[in-house]
Amino acid sequence: MIVDGMTMFFYLWEDIDDNVWDLRYFVLRLHDTVARIKLVRAWQDKSDYADLIAGKNELLEKIRSNAHYRLLGEDQQEKLVTGEQIFVGGMRRAAMQTGAWREETFIATYNYLSAHSHSAPISFFRFSSHSIDYRSPSHAQFASACFAIEIATACLRRVTLRYLDYHLEKFPQSKNEFADSFVQKLRDKDGTRYLFT
């Protein structure tokens, strides 16, 4: 989902202490390793993916010995070593740290869009009242699609602005009238969006 992508972009781009960065990296690798174990264990003997289990254990050692990890509360530490979390501090916190979202807007947007991808009740309880029809889409169907496209556009614009800011800061010689005009137009559009303000 594009909201996840934008959050991850800002999360990985953030200028942070080496210990925090190392912990984030180990947690991402642990999540990947645990996901792979869940995938292969249905079809393989444990001995066939022993390397993944060994890798998981090595990552757990690295996480537990990380200086930033030891500063976290016990509840957060327990969550991180499950391999179920992608973001240190959780996704909501990561999204808030991007500075791109108001918390209520993020929660509402993420909840609504993920409900459809997970076939949660919000995605089908109102089928009849919203006149859901795949031959002749209803207003509710168009509104949902428009909302998703607007969110995707806003997220891509926000990431583009962040990258352009970085690029123009690092390579000031690349500034020109076109770039200035383009960036300003993006900023104007971004500033008028209710999504992030």
Task: Report each predicted region and the residues it spans.
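Long, hydrophobic, well-ordered secondary-structure blocks that form the structural core
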Residues: M1-L39
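Short, hydrophobic, well-ordered secondary-structure elements
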Residues: M1-E14, Y110-S114, T153-L161
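Secondary-shell segments that build the walls of catalytic and ion/ligand-binding clefts
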Residues: R29-F147, R157-T197
